[in-house]
Amino acid sequence: LLFIKRNIYIVPLYNICYMKKPFVHKKYLKLYEETAKNKIAGILFKYPDKEFSLSDLAREAGVAKANIGNILNEFQKAGLITVEKLSKIWRIKANQANWLFIRNKIVYNLGFVYRSGLVEFLVEHFKNPKAIVLFGSFRKGEDLSGSDVDIAIESNEVSDYQIIELRELIEFEKIIERRIQIHLFKRESIDEN
């Protein structure tokens, strides 16, 4: 069963919302397609602490090994990655100290949260809360493979600050491949100091 509500597809079986794809004129379609560069960058953003061989990275990203060399050279020149060549083996790792990498990782993380449908779910589950705030290492682009996603929700329906876990978030955690922590608070009960 699929219900449509305000350009959002709602799949009740999984309690996950998927945004409707926008209609795009053919000449602009290339802007929306996922390119080989985006796929490789996505893997590096998702696993910034992992070291890849050329073959591993190509396989993870779903990109032909023959095409990956030029992309990696471009990423290396921009300082996004470090490449160590040991004879025929390449060791490729994200350069987490590079400001350009961090900035792009923040954009990737925010986009990832929106594409997963998590924001729409939280708005509906918490009955249109006053604020939903993404914070912590995931928001700063400093998250690693094992990091969690910290989300604060301002609601008048709670009396004290509390950290909760929702059973419904399990599906989102599978999509994002991160644990999600919800921090509920009421602005009046928070100490400003």
Positions of the model-derived regions?
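Catalytic core of pol beta-like nucleotidyltransferases
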Residues: 2-128, 140-146, 155-193
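Short helix-loop-helix/strand-helix junction enriched in hydrophobic and basic residues
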Residues: 131-138
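Short, well-ordered beta-strand segments
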Residues: 150-152
